[in-house]
Amino acid sequence: MSKKTFEELFTELQHKAANGDPSTSRTAELVGKGVHAIGKKVVEEAAEVWMAAEYEGKDAAAEEISQLLYHVQVMMVARGISLDDVYAHL
C-alpha cells in the first residue's frame, strides 16, 4: 500500500476532482454529487471510527480514520477549502 501525507492526498484529490471521470474516480463522483452526499459519508465514516476504536483493534481504527480523513478532504475540495484555511484554525 502506498503511503501519502495529508498534504499529498489533498493535492491528489484536488486533481481528481478537477480532471477525474466520475465513472472511474470515486472522488470525482462524490464531488459531482455535492456537499450533502459527501456529508453523509463523513457522518458514516465518523461512526465507523468510533465503533472501530471502541470494539476493534488499532489497525481497524486506523483504517477507518484514514477513510474519514479522505471524506473530510473530499468535502474540503468540494467547498473550495484549502489546507491553509483549516490550518488557520488549529
Swiss-Prot record:
Question: Cellular location of this protein?
Answer: Cytoplasm
Top enzyme category: hydrolase
Tell me its EC number(s), please: 3.6.1.31
The processes (GO biological process) annotated in the record are: L-histidine biosynthetic process
Taxonomically, the superkingdom here is Bacteria
Give a Gene Ontology cellular component term annotated to this protein: cytoplasm
Annotated pathway: Amino-acid biosynthesis; L-histidine biosynthesis; L-histidine from 5-phospho-alpha-D-ribose 1-diphosphate: step 2/9
Q: Annotated Gene Ontology MF terms?
A: ATP binding; phosphoribosyl-ATP diphosphatase activity
Q: Name one Pfam family in it.
A: PRA-PH
Name the predominant localization. cytoplasm
What reaction(s) does this enzyme catalyze?
1-(5-phospho-beta-D-ribosyl)-ATP + H2O = 1-(5-phospho-beta-D-ribosyl)-5'-AMP + diphosphate + H(+)
Report keywords, A-Z: Amino-acid biosynthesis, ATP-binding, Cytoplasm, Histidine biosynthesis, Hydrolase, Nucleotide-binding
Q: Which family does the similarity line name?
A: Belongs to the PRA-PH family.
What is the name of the protein in this document?
Phosphoribosyl-ATP pyrophosphatase
What is the native source organism of this protein? Streptomyces avermitilis (strain ATCC 31267 / DSM 46492 / JCM 5070 / NBRC 14893 / NCIMB 12804 / NRRL 8165 / MA-4680)
The lineage is: Bacteria, Bacillati, Actinomycetota, Actinomycetes, Kitasatosporales
Q: In the UniProt record, what gene is named as encoding this protein?
A: hisE
